[in-house]
């Protein structure tokens, strides 16, 4: 990752239409603020994540996924041990909302995510992978949004206060 102003890391572009990443992460693990040139679908088969952007925080419990549009700076915090499965999707494949959202993961979408993760990537010149891409695009377009967003206040004073609270939330005095 390359570092830019404001401590945002820019991840390098990935070579395939869909590329995956899998992590087993401990409680309170934090992934610092960064962005990707690809769209990102983050699914936790176990554990809870919170995803922060400049516009709000999305809570992502199991059986939900968060859609993060390409080039959206974000940070992620784990609550409990998390089994994270991520799909990085080239923007040319999917024309979804330009905003982050948490989606309900149907059993079919869950199995498709896990299958693509087992493959590691979907290659452009593989016809079977093309069919999986098409199914992924269709299922993402049909996925229902789950109301799990905590928007930041619009008032600048309230937003500054909320930012301070969020910055302090992970410190030990707030933990049990």
Predicted regions and their residues:
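Generic protein-terminus/edge-of-domain signal
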Residues: 1-48
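Short acidic-glycine-tyrosine-enriched beta hairpin
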Residues: 25, 55-71
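A short beta-strand-loop-beta hairpin characteristic of the jelly-roll/cupin
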Residues: 42-61
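Ligand-binding loop in jelly-roll beta-barrel domains
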Residues: 57, 71-100, 105
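Basic, amphipathic alpha-helical hairpins
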Residues: 116-124, 139-147, 161-174
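N-terminal positioning helix adjacent to the helix-turn-helix/winged-helix DNA-binding module
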Residues: 128, 132, 153-161, 173
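Linker/hinge segments immediately adjacent to helix-turn-helix/homeobox DNA-binding domains
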Residues: 131-154
